């Protein structure tokens, strides 16, 4: 205030302050008064929100006899009479049954629509008929007062909240705020939050530092097309959204940061895939300085299994160390560079015994076989399996089987009969076995066989352990491959990797 003494002949004053002079205490009083005025509502139909005592998934038998205040959405009402009804109140945490026993509150409910926001003040009592399927199924609340905090204007909702997943996708997206009230939909967001929190805690526990890298950056080749953002002050120039924080984390390592991680957003302009959402996704991104492959493996073998065991469907994950499978072996035995090791089936090579059997698609091609022992599938199930394989891989699957007497039957068996002994010996077949086959160049035959393997494992009992997660590391990827669409040499994976020392001479 010293600089302003010449400009102001009088001190600050306030009509509400004693003597008109403004003191620190007066300032605080004025702030409190103004805050109080802010919370005064001028519209009578808007009611200020008061703190609830419990949420709708919280009350238990221990709360019987307590007066509580609940706030949530009006989900449903089962009307028994004009002065008796059973209301379901829902919030983020769950549902509570409200037993209305007064005509006044029943009339209030009849004047509002489902999904209106209401406040209930009432007393908790034990249910006479308990619901073991609900966390709050042992209690109910008898309301003494119901206050409508926000009316839903529509008599009919675009879909039933608890069945929103059955609605048209465009309708769900238009009314996403209603869709997210569905506990099944909401649970995915809750799960993601918990997984990310535990991942973050585990990485920090391993001395990693979380660092957020820039989103607007320059373009760098990562294997997909970039999303571009026009630079407003530089016409004709663009930022790129990062496909991965690769360059930034390498910069961090060079600058002396020893261990980095982030839950990184990645943007890739590519079509949707079975294992990847289009446009954007998030990944646990990490980098370690002065580390080798086994150092990285050791960290993740400690971080991942507990997360999957805690939040996964099966609650069991393979123990470290994980299997190490070379890329070529993975493609040869499993037809995939990310094999599902829960499936007991393996891919075998049948080129030598079947390429010249007289069946057109096999001629001059590689032939791969998947043998399912003691197979019990019906012809209808086999046809569906072949159709599913073609949808996923774009290639046909062929088959034959050995009946209980060891005779070839079904599918392309007539082309195999003359080579039966060689085929049985090469594939180790026995009576009751089923053989599914793929054909094409090496890569096509392998990938199609991989789809066959996964389809049989998932469709027929006895070939897949479905109650656990099986992890592995696929190592020794090739640096380049011929692109399926371009036909040109392309990176097989992210090129930002340490050199394999035995390849230095190349």
Segments predicted by a language model, with ranges:
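Exposed boundary/loop context
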Residues: 1, 12-13, 34, 65, ...
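Short hydrophobic alpha-helical segments enriched in small aliphatic residues
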Residues: 2-7, 17, 27-29
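Short, positively charged and aromatic/hydrophobic N-terminal segments
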Residues: 9-12, 23, 28-33, 37-40, ...
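Class II aminoacyl-tRNA synthetase catalytic cores and aaRS-like
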Residues: 28, 41-506
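Accessible peptide chain termini
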Residues: 1-3, 48-49
């Amino acid at each position: 205030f010293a600089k302003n003494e010449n400009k102001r002949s009088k001190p600050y004053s306030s009509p509400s302050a004693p003597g008109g002079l403004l003191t620190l205490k007066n300032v605080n009083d004025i702030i409190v008064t103004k805050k109080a005025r802010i919370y005064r509502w001028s519209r009578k139909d808007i009611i200020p929100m008061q703190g609830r005592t419990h949420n709708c998934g919280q009350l238990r038998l221990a709360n019987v006899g307590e007066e509580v205040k609940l706030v949530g959405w009006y989900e449903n009402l089962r009307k028994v009479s004009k002065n008796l009804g059973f209301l379901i109140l829902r919030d983020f945490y769950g549902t509570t049954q409200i037993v209305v026993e007064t005509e006044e509150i029943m009339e209030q409910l009849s004047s509002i629509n489902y999904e209106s926001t209401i406040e209930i003040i009432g007393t908790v009592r034990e249910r006479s008929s308990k619901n073991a399927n609900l966390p709050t199924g042992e209690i109910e609340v008898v309301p003494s007062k119901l206050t409508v905090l926000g009316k839903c204007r529509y008599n009919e909702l675009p879909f039933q909240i608890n069945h929103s997943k059955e609605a048209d996708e465009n309708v769900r997206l238009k009314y996403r705020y209603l869709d997210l009230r569905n506990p099944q939909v909401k649970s995915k967001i809750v799960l993601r939050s918990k997984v990310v929190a535990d991942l973050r805690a585990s990485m920090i526990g391993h001395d990693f530092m979380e660092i957020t890298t820039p989103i607007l950056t320059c373009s760098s080749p990562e294997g997909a097309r970039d999303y571009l953002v026009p630079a407003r002050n530089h016409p004709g120039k663009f930022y790129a959204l990062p496909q991965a924080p690769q360059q930034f984390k390498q910069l961090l390592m060079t600058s002396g940061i020893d261990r980095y991680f982030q839950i990184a957003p990645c943007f890739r302009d590519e079509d949707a895939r079975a294992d990847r959402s289009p446009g954007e996704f998030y990944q646990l991104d990490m980098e370690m300085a002065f580390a080798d492959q086994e150092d990285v493996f050791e960290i993740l073998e400690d971080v991942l299994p507990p997360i999957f065991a805690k939040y996964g469907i099966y609650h069991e994950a393979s123990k470290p160390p994980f299997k190490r499978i070379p890329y070529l072996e993975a493609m040869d035995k499993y037809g995939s560079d990310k094999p599902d090791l829960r499936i007991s089936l393996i891919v075998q090579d049948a080129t030598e015994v079947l390429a010249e059997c007289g069946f057109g698609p096999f001629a001059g091609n590689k032939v791969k076989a998947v043998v399912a022992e003691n197979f019990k599938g019906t012809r209808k199930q086999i046809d569906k399996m072949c159709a599913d394989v073609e949808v996923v891989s774009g290639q046909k699957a062929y088959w034959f089987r050995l009946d209980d007497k060891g005779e070839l039957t079904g599918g392309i068996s007539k082309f195999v009969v003359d080579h039966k002994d060689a085929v049985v010996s090469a594939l180790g077949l026995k009576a009751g076995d089923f053989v599914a086959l793929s054909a094409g160049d090496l890569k096509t035959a392998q990938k199609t066989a991989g789809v066959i393997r996964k389809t049989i494992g998932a469709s027929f009992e006895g070939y897949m352990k479905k109650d656990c997660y099986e992890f592995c590391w696929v190592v020794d990827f090739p640096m380049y491959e011929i692109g399926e669409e371009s036909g040109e040499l392309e990176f097989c994976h992210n090129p930002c990797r340490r050199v394999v020392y035995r390849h230095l001479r190349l």
